[in-house]
Amino acid sequence: MGLSDGEWQLVLNVWGKVEGDLSGHGQEVLIRLFKGHPETLEKFDKFKHLKAEDEMRASEELKKHGTTVLTALGGILKKKGQHAAELAPLAQSHATKHKIPVKYLEFISEAIIQVLQSKHPGDFGADAQGAMSKALELFRNDIAAKYKELGFQG
């Protein structure tokens, strides 16, 4: 289920746009995640109290965490599927400490796609969307495999 060189190029081209405003993109991704799937908010002790979108937008902690999430994801995407070293600590913390189910990674993947569609319609056409979906699925599948190795049934 690997991506072609052309698909990776599409992914990295749009990711360059994301890196121009990591905090803005990250904040938007988390807001979409929490609004679309409120149950995910329960996994974040420091954000549980944020119920309204305006509260989320005003939270510097949420913006900071969004930056952290997208920085980590960008590092993984740039490895073009050769991301085992980057993935291992992420899988470890998300399985053992945070206990984030794979389903929630699907939810955040959807939010990422939606944010990219919204913010970069000219650079995120059908081909780029398909490539990004494949890249995020590869990431999720590899995380799920690591979860299994760790005995986490997320």
UniProtKB/Swiss-Prot annotation:
What CDD domains has UniProt attached to this entry? Mb
**Boundaries of every Globin domain copy:** 2-148
Give the domain of life: Eukaryota
GO MF terms here are: heme binding; metal ion binding; nitrite reductase activity; oxygen binding; oxygen carrier activity; peroxidase activity
The primary location reported for this protein is: cytoplasm
Pfam families tied to this protein: Globin
Which biological processes are named by the entry's GO terms? Answer: removal of superoxide radicals
Annotated positions binding nitrite? 65
Q: Which reaction does it catalyse?
A: Fe(III)-heme b-[protein] + nitric oxide + H2O = Fe(II)-heme b-[protein] + nitrite + 2 H(+); H2O2 + AH2 = A + 2 H2O
Binding-site list for heme b: 94
Q: Where in the cell is it found?
A: Cytoplasm, Sarcoplasm
Any GO CC annotation of this UniProt entry: sarcoplasm
Any idea which positions bind O2?
A: 65
Where in the sequence is Phosphoserine found?
A: 4
Top enzyme class, one word, equals oxidoreductase
Phosphothreonine: residues carrying this PTM = 68
EC number(s) reported in the record: 1.7.-.-, 1.11.1.-
Alphabetical keyword list: Cytoplasm, Heme, Iron, Metal-binding, Muscle protein, Oxidoreductase, Oxygen transport, Phosphoprotein, Transport
Q: What does this protein do?
A: Monomeric heme protein which primary function is to store oxygen and facilitate its diffusion within muscle tissues. Reversibly binds oxygen through a pentacoordinated heme iron and enables its timely and efficient release as needed during periods of heightened demand. Depending on the oxidative conditions of tissues and cells, and in addition to its ability to bind oxygen, it also has a nitrite reductase activity whereby it regulates the production of bioactive nitric oxide.
- Check the record and name the PANTHER family matching this protein: MYOGLOBIN
What is said about its interaction partners and assembly?
Monomeric.
Which family, according to UniProt?
A: Belongs to the globin family.
Specify the protein name: Myoglobin
Biological source species? Proechimys guairae (Guaira spiny rat)
